[in-house]
């Protein structure tokens, strides 16, 4: 099962419809975090530290569905925490899929095969498996031996059963570029739809701040890792990959990925949680975005995350015929605007 063309048509129509309505800011992807608890303790993860006081809290199925409805985006990215730990994750996924929204569920794959027994394959559903390198590098990054093998088996099993599968990789300072390239080739050869990639964001709650990569250093890494001649299938759209290489610039549009958590909607964005609100419309105000973004808030200075800039490439492509044609030729609208946690 490959990338559905229906997503390309629906996403394009959705954007044009909102533009006609005169909406300057609106969501492309609902980032849904039904819990923040995880069964791993990755060094670069800010969520399990930031939400330490509510790790036992679950968002109910009905509240998840209401958040998706309030946002209205055609794409839902389920993150966390580890979503498969939610006792009703199958109901959350299946009921959103029943609405014909496209669901991407992030997972470390430890419980993925168990979840497959309750969530059937669908063109509207895709596993996004976290992979940070080949076996030694990945197991080191998640602080547990054997996770790479478990994830690899789960990916193979899911593909064999007809599920859509992608991977998601976070690039940190000091990464082994050759190891990343080998992993991307490995996943491409396994038959995943593509590999998502993004630099790690500098969460202040993470003790080891040397882990995070600067914007300048990240672009040097991506110029090498994203070399098109390697034949790797990347899931991010080609304009965003150009941005990662430093070949183009965009203004952050993180409002396009509103994030719902056990405490409500994160404000202002998926990465920064200065406060939480119960009204998603608060995230689209002019006043709010006068305060955030590169050059406005120092915390945004090194950010290259797809949740802020991949959507920006989509919005701009629709106003630049050359970029739009390139997106169509490379089949990129099927996966455009995806942000994975």
Question: Regions from the language model: what does each represent?
Answer:
Residues 2-118, 122-123, 330-333, 341:
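Conserved alpha-helical substructure of the radical SAM core
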Residues 81-82, 198, 309:
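Short, solvent-exposed turn/loop segments enriched in Gly/Ser/Thr/Pro and often Arg
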Residues 37, 41, 251, 299-302:
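The −1 position to Zn-ligating cysteines in a subset of zinc-ribbon hairpins
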Residues 17-21, 243-247, 289-290:
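Short, P/G- and charge-enriched loop/turn segments at secondary-structure junctions
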Residues 26, 265-341:
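Flexible mid-to-C-terminal extensions adjoining Fe-S/redox cofactors in radical SAM and related proteins
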Residues 115, 137-141:
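Short, charged, surface-exposed secondary-structure boundary motifs
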Residues 59-60, 125-132, 140-267, 271, ...:
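Radical SAM enzyme [4Fe-4S]-AdoMet core and its adjacent flexible, acidic
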